[in-house]
């Protein structure tokens, strides 16, 4: 493709390479390093004048360092006269801080949106935003892609009894997500209502729906410490589910997450590769990965060629 340059930040180079391979491109030359005082240094190693630039950087790992690196890369390309800079952020950082849920709380997702715009981003491509209203925090175009088509494909190909499954949301907020998947599979859905006492602590869970003698598939956009989904798995099995799977777009898996998954009764915990999972998979055989590089690659190709991206909301590109 002419007039396109693809750069990778240091957060998820494996995903960036997969996207580049699918597009038939070489990743652009960029050197990122830290000065002795821990400031981030970025050197763009090739001309981007008049080019359509895409920078792939996920909000994972050392999140603050990676966000700063992305902002500097965007700005470096912008002031080097690139025609357009698109930030491809598979897992959007600070997405859970999207509203004032208590007094004096910051809306950090809005701050990140402002920072990206000020740095010089012209367009954002992301996946399964924790809250879809984050798109409205930007004054530039945002394409929020969905992992749902890839999730549906995985369910049909890997769960033999999928026609006898029930899609379960671990909280009321994910009801829209699970009803969409349940409708596409033509199966029923259930949800678990949880009463939280404080962050990362779940108090009481109430199951709404009948899971007896069915394969329960928990679906959520992200899992961090995995307390919620592991409690939910126990709840579903005690309510008569034959097997429990969990399918998540963003597998953050921090703190006690891996030991909780190992001790829980999941058949599999399936995540996409918006966040690197290689190290986690070494310590947990239940984790399986859906590759979404083809969705990102096709979104980049369509954006570059001025084509519609909405086809990707319901189809997995070949």
From Swiss-Prot:
ATP binds at residues 96-101, 130. Its cofactor is Mg(2+). One of its GO terms (cellular component) is cytosol. It holds the Pfam family Pribosyltran_N. Residues 212-227 are annotated as: Binding of phosphoribosylpyrophosphate. It comes from the Eukaryota. It catalyses: D-ribose 5-phosphate + ATP = 5-phospho-alpha-D-ribose 1-diphosphate + AMP + H(+). One of its GO terms (molecular function) is identical protein binding. Its EC number is 2.7.6.1. The keyword Magnesium applies. It is an enzyme of class 2 (transferase). Mg(2+) binds at residues 128, 130, 139, 143. One of its GO terms (biological process) is pentose-phosphate shunt. SUPFAM superfamilies: PRTase-like. Disulfide bonds: none annotated. HAMAP family: RibP_PPkinase_B. NCBIfam families: PRK01259.1 (NF002320), ribP_PPkin (TIGR01251). Belongs to the ribose-phosphate pyrophosphokinase family. Homodimer. The active form is probably a hexamer composed of 3 homodimers. This is Ribose-phosphate pyrophosphokinase 2. It comes from Homo sapiens. The lineage of its organism: Eukaryota, Metazoa, Chordata, Craniata, Vertebrata.
